[in-house]
Structure formats: C-alpha cells, structure tokens
Amino acid sequence: MRIKFLKAATTIALCGGLVAGCSGENGTADPVSSAPTSTSTEITSTPAASSSAPVAASCGSDLLASLSLRQKLAQLLNVGVTGTDDAVSIVQNEEIGGIFVGSWTDQSMLTNREVPQVASASKLPLMVTIDEEGGRVSRVADILGPDPSARETAQTMTVEQTYQMALERGRGLKDLGITVNYAPDVDVSSQPDDSVIGDRSYSDDPQTVVAYAGAYAQGMRDAGIFPVIKHFPGHGSASGDSHRGEVTTPPLQDLIASDLIPFRELSGTGVGVMMGHLEVPGLTEPGTPASISPAAVALLRDGVGYGAAPFTGPVFTDDLSGMQAITDRYDIADAVQAALVAGVDQALWLTTDDVPRVLDHLEQAVASGELPQTRVDQAVVTVAAAKGAVTC
C-alpha cells in the first residue's frame, strides 16, 4: 500500500481563516514529497473530531447566531475529567467543547462505554480527547495493551507497520468513545530515552520523523480519530522540562532548519497542532511561551516564516494548569485568556473545578475588549469545523 498525504482534503480547510505531553504529570507528560511510500491509503476526508452527529450550520454563521457569548467561550475549553459523573456535570452545566481523558480518569467511563452518555449531555458535538502516544505516554495500555514508544517504533518497525499499528490503536480508541488523539509527537530529538521528550521522538532526523509520524497520523485518521501533532515549534532540542519550569529552545533559525520540518510537511495533512510551552529566541517575547504567544501562533498560521502553507486547522494549547512553565507565571484564567488572544482555538487544562471562574473571566475580557469578539467567533467556527459541526 502507499500512504498519500493529501493537503487539500480536510474538513477543517473548508472553513479556512475562520496543539511536553498534555498530561501535566511530571515524568510522564504527557511538501509531502517526503511522505512514506510503503503503504497505500488516500485521505479523502478528515474524521470529525466529535462524538455525535453534526449540527446544521452554513459556514458557521447559523451556529454563531444560535450561541450566547458564554456558550461560545465554553466551546473553546477542553478540560480533564475524573470520570463519567464529573464529565456529564461539566458538559451539561457549562457546555464546554471538549473533555480530556487522563491517567487519573476512572477508566470505567471507557470500558463501560459511558462516553455516549457524556456526549448526549452536550448540545453540540463533543470532543473527547486523549494523550495516547505509546510507550510511557499511554492512557489506555491497560485496556488496549501497550504500544511501543515512537523511538522504538522507528527503530524496529517499517512505516507500513507503523500505519497498521496506528490504525488498530485508532479503532480501539474510537470504540472507547475517543474522538481526538494528541499524537503523534513530531519533535526532532536525540535526547536520552528518559528525558522529557527522549523516546517520545521518532528520531533526530526530521525526514524520519515526517515518515513515521505521518504514517501514525494517517492510521489515526483512517480509524476515525482526529490526530494532533505537537509541540510547535519544536521541543526536541529545548533545555528543560515545561512540567517543571521555563523551557528555551534553540533560536528560530535553528528550528527552521530541523525542528520545524515535520510541522511544515505534515500540518496540511488533516491534523490539529498543539502549541508547546516553549520560549523561542527570535520569535517569542521573554517570559512568553509559544502556547500564549501571538508571534508563535502567527508563524504557524501564516506558514511563510518557515516555508509552510498557511494552517487553517485547530490550534490547541498544551496543559495550562499542571505545567510550571505556565503556572509559575499565570493563573489559569489569565493563561486561557492569553492563549485565546494569541490565536489558539482551544485551551486545555486538567480539572473541571475552575471552569465557571474561567468563563466569568473570559466574558469580562470580551466586554472590556481585551479578548476580541471576532477572535472568539473565529475560534468557535474552527473548533466546530474540526468536529464536523459546520459545513462550509
């Protein structure tokens, strides 16, 4: 078979213009010419990243008109849940756009097939997200069995075998009710296996990362799971661990020559992108990680600065509540606001406790003009398009 990465055939692209691992748990983290040639499957569509049928809307205008400001803002939040009751409560009461299944989540929500119960509490399609890379970053190994780390995969498997492994894992995730996987990790790294990225990276060779990560993302897509590549603009050569504090990458020009190549090659293949909590000399302001940096999001969106096509898909933050690169400087409400202002479409954090307070804060930010209404509307439509909730 042959895997082909078709850049134009994505659900998200139809609404153009309009995501360290995302677990926050210390130590666990959470041009297509280089596409693999050993398998043959065409991307003819991108799976809708939600757990229920789409709602009718025309390029987002009908959807936007049907939502209050608070409902719009809630669609831009994705939070970790402890189990079914917690998930149903936050979805029903606050109408958030997504839930995150972490290592602390009661697995009975998955094994008892209770995700549809959660999704039915939502008026709009619900993103059900997970951080399932394989190796040490796996949330369902006890249910579906272990998969190898990215590095072990590239060292022991062919590209075709990687595609088949991802296809099987994706089908397993879909059967459990998952719709979005914050994987594959496309960081380019030669770090030791047990470092923050380490064996989560396929290789220190960018083209090897493109081939294997591309095959993994393709397998997820073909299984009906929406893949999210990470951690933009590249964590593989950074100093430090964003779970524990500030992280600085090599200068932007160095990233363009290596770390950004997988993003350039894969961002147009029907994926989302997760922003890393990374300070980048020559790109971000001091003290402002890429996840909340307008300049970093603009680099991704425009593409021009690193030779990529414009990116019109959904942009996610890494965890904003459990990683000290953010929490040492920002309260969760301020961090979410900063991310949305910067151009991110959906903010991720690990508990439901602060959702009402964050929504209150964001409503005030819109009222004061600090968070433009147009930015909110753009993000709502981008997220809705990724869920298949708008047709454009």
Identify the function of each model-found stretch.
Residues 81-93, 162-172, 256-262, 330-338:
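Short, acidic/polar
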Residues 119-145, 162-188, 209, 213-233:
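Glycine-rich, aromatic-flanked loop segments that form ligand/cofactor-binding clefts
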